[in-house]
Structures are given as C-alpha cells and as structure tokens.
C-alpha cells in the first residue's frame, strides 16, 4: 500500500522488511464460522506449529524449517490463502486453499513456483486445558532452472500432530 500511494520513508524498492508479516481480511459469523483471505498463518501452523512454537520461537522441528520457504510452500505464513475455520462442539475444524503464487528465488539460481494446494486440520479440545491437533498440507509446485531449462513438478505433503496441555500456569506440548 505505501508504494501505491508514494508514502515517503514507508517503502523502498526491493526491500522485504515486511514480507514476513501477515495481511489478510475476512468475515466472521457465529453461525457459519470464519473465512479469511491473504497472507496469514497456515492451517498447519494454527493446529500443529503454534502448540510447539513456545520455546524461544526457534521452529527448528516445524514444517517451515524443513521446506523451501514457509510463505510460499504453505507451511507457515502462507501468501494468497483462503482459510475457513468453524467450531463444532469440542472441535475446531480448518480448511484452506492455496492459490498460485509468484516465483520465489531461493538465491541458488533456481526458481520455485507454487501452482496451488490446500490444507485440512482439526483441533480437538479433549478437556478445557488439553488440546490435540492434527493437520495435513498439500502444495503443488514447480522448480525450474533457467540456466539449463530443467524443470520438475513436486507434490509436497506435510502431515503433523501436536498435543498441548496447559494446567494452571504451566504449559506442556509435544
């Protein structure tokens, strides 16, 4: 937005200072649930990652630390994502669709391009302080080498589960 309005000192060509932030909009209804679109936490992160991302925010064992880039491959703050959440009884049910995105240049001469994807997840509240979550994320992407013309399509899948127990002032997660 700052670039579109030429706001001085709020935008620099080529800068990526705010590209890891979230920017999304949505609608919420007590009856129908929540529908959002934009760059936001993925279903996988909401259901699995957030439970274990509590110690020093290192994310080493999480999907964004294993994929090419969490903003592009759908594992963290996914860009161009439509996400739905609905609470039914003791369960929070999630679904998302990842739209095709622009190319990501990882710095090694290759080009990564997400073609699409989606996620499903559930957070089941076993008790008021014990929650079990499971999520699956699928991303279809192309990796291209412009130097030699090589190209390959990938079907990326992430499947994970996490348990969070928060009795009194304590937090345990796995």
Label the model's feature ranges:
Residues 1-100, 114, 123-126:
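Outer membrane beta-barrel
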Residues 6-12, 44, 98-116, 137-152:
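Sequence/structural signature of outer-membrane beta-barrel proteins
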Residues 89, 113-174:
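Detector for outer-membrane/organellar transmembrane beta-barrel domains
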Residues 51, 62-64, 91, 98, ...:
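Residue-level detector of solvent-exposed, low-hydrophobicity positions
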């Amino acid at each position: 937005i700052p670039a579109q309005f030429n706001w001085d000192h709020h935008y620099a060509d080529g800068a990526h200072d705010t590209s890891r932030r979230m920017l999304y909009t949505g609608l919420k209804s007590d009856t129908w649930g929540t529908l959002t679109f934009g760059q936001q936490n993925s279903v996988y992160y909401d259901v699995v990652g957030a439970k274990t991302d509590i110690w020093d925010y290192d994310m080493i064992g999480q999907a964004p630390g294993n994929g090419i880039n969490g903003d592009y491959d759908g594992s963290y703050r996914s860009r161009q994502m439509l996400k739905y959440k609905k609470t039914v009884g003791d369960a929070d049910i999630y679904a998302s669709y990842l739209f095709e995105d622009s190319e990501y240049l990882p710095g090694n001469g290759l080009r990564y391009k997400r073609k699409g994807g989606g996620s499903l997840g559930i957070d089941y509240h076993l008790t008021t302080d014990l929650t079990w979550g499971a999520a699956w994320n699928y991303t279809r992407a192309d990796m291209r080498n412009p130097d030699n013309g090589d190209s390959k399509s990938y079907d990326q899948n992430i499947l994970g589960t996490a348990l969070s127990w928060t009795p009194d002032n304590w937090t345990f997660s796995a």
